[in-house]
């Protein structure tokens, strides 16, 4: 029997500042958080202020497309 899929969906939050800086950063790569959101309550893309270890500061993390 298949698992019940509810309104919760897994989303990836990507550091917006890392993607804007491009190649001029100390560490290569972009930091991502994995979280869940409720599709029924929050239909707009998720934006949270989280800590980025590559930027070494709190930055805005935006939901990215899969």
Swiss-Prot record:
GO terms for molecular function: structural constituent of ribosome. PROSITE patterns: RIBOSOMAL_L33. InterPro entries: Ribosomal_bL33, Ribosomal_bL33_CS, Ribosomal_bL33_sf, Ribosomal_zn-bd. It is found in: Plastid, Chloroplast. Its main location: plastid. Keywords: Chloroplast, Plastid, Ribonucleoprotein, Ribosomal protein. GO terms for cellular component: chloroplast; ribonucleoprotein complex; ribosome. It holds the Pfam family Ribosomal_L33. It comes from the Eukaryota. SUPFAM superfamilies: Zn-binding ribosomal proteins. One of its GO terms (biological process) is translation. Belongs to the bacterial ribosomal protein bL33 family. HAMAP family: Ribosomal_bL33. This is Large ribosomal subunit protein bL33c. The lineage of its organism: Eukaryota, Viridiplantae, Streptophyta, Embryophyta, Tracheophyta.
């Amino acid at each position: 029997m298949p698992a019940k899929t509810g309104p919760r969906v897994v989303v990836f939050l990507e550091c917006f500042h890392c993607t804007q800086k491009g190649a001029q950063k100390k560490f290569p790569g972009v930091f991502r958080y994995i979280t869940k959101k409720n599709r029924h309550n929050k239909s707009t893309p998720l934006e949270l202020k989280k800590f980025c270890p590559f930027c070494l500061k709190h930055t805005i993390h935006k939901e990215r497309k899969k």
